[in-house]
């Protein structure tokens, strides 16, 4: 089993040609960016009524609910994916089997400073009314 800081570095060294020392350090420190990281793992199980995509979506929904609960408790959380999610080689380094996929990482901590204000979004860009 790997030490958590080695998983991402080993993967990067095996798969990226243009690695700098700075980038290697970034990957080495990734697991320490927050006091707690929840790794969201979707486990595919053959089921006649629940297709694989619904199983993955359900894991994502569980992750979103975790984030909502954390926010309600005053914690900060950010969901990250990137090269280290939906990646069989990373899943293997975590000791997962072929039916398991990492769909994301939730970094959890106590927010520092004021909450950033976000620009208002026009919901018409995302919602359609079907009459």
Residue ranges and their predicted role:
Residues 35-37, 76, 101-103:
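Structural motif
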Residues 38, 44-92:
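Small-aliphatic-rich amphipathic alpha-helix that forms the alpha element of a beta-alpha
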Residues 102-131:
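C-terminal helix-cap and adjacent tail motif
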């Amino acid at each position: 089993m790997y030490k958590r800081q080695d998983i991402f570095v080993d993967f990067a060294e095996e798969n990226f040609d243009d690695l700098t020392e700075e980038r290697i350090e970034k990957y080495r420190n990734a697991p320490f960016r927050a006091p707690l990281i929840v790794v969201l793992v979707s486990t595919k199980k053959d089921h006649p009524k629940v297709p694989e995509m619904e199983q993955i979506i359900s894991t994502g929904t569980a992750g979103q609910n975790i984030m909502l609960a954390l926010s309600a408790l005053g914690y900060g959380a950010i969901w990250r994916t990137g090269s280290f999610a939906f990646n069989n080689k990373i899943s293997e380094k975590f000791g997962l089997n072929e039916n398991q996929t990492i769909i994301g990482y939730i970094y959890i901590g106590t927010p520092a400073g004021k909450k950033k204000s976000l620009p208002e979004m026009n919901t018409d860009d995302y919602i359609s009314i079907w009459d």
